[in-house]
Amino acid sequence: NNLLVSYINQTGEEVFLDGFWSESKSWFVEGKSSAVLSEENPTETLSYVLQIGEGFVQKDLTFSYDSYEVVINTNLRGIKNDVLDGNFRLDWVGGLPLTEPSQDGMFLEGLVGQGGDIESFKAGSAGLFGSSSGAIERSAKQYTGPADFVGYRTKYFGVFFVPQKTDFVEIAKYSSDKRIAVDVITNQNINFEETTLYLGPLEYGEISNLGVGIEEKILGWQWLSSVSWLVYSIMIFMYGLIPNYGIVVVLFAILIKTVTYPLMAKQLRSSKKMQEINPLLNN
């Protein structure tokens, strides 16, 4: 279970809500033990409760069809008298599996959005030819003040929290089971229960739907972002006409060659002229 809820009680002890969460109500319909999301059934909410003393904590997870977003509602009002300062923590623990261990370390990066700016925290330690979790020392970086999002990315995937409201976030990295692990932490008030969790590929359209600017980081270096955006836009347009990325890539390569041919032809002519006059220069 990567998703963890915790809080500080009135005696200053941290309480981790990692016990057995039971369903608050049965969502099974007509004896079915699962739900299938579709255009006819676009959302499904799973509700769980955990008893703490005489009170209850409720956690709702809302999944949407054709989306990598999960809306999390965490209700601690049933134990609010035990929660110090009315704040709780929502953590994503352990990070994501590495799809390419030899290269992912180069791309592991914690990201925090604050005031329209994106702060970066390098989580990996890798060279061009490999990565080593043993080289990772446990460290963390904390950010105070309102944050639009917090999370981290691998080469192809990302996990991000987009909280309703938070004044403190943290990213921690360490070695676990011979791989790099990353924890993402948000601190929230119990009156602001909703958090959006994005867990999926770094696909520009999906990321931009979050509306917090994460897509700016997946376009690469800033000086390349305009070119990356142009390439992305052209390929998406072509995919809309021909829904096959293999064919789109081939056609895009032909398009690039056609556009750059005049320049290449000019260079070839110049090179040929240099070869013709080279004997004269040597004489």
Regions from the language model: what does each represent?
Residues 1-217:
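Soluble non-transmembrane domains of integral membrane proteins
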Residues 72-73, 234-237, 280-281:
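Short, hydrophobic/aromatic alpha-helical segments in well-folded domains
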Residues 188, 238, 257, 281:
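Conserved hydrophobic/aromatic pocket- or pore-lining residues that grip, position, or stack substrates
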Residues 194, 198-248:
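Interfacial loop/helix-cap signal at membrane boundaries in integral membrane proteins
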Residues 259-283:
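Membrane-interface amphipathic helices and adjacent TM-edge segments
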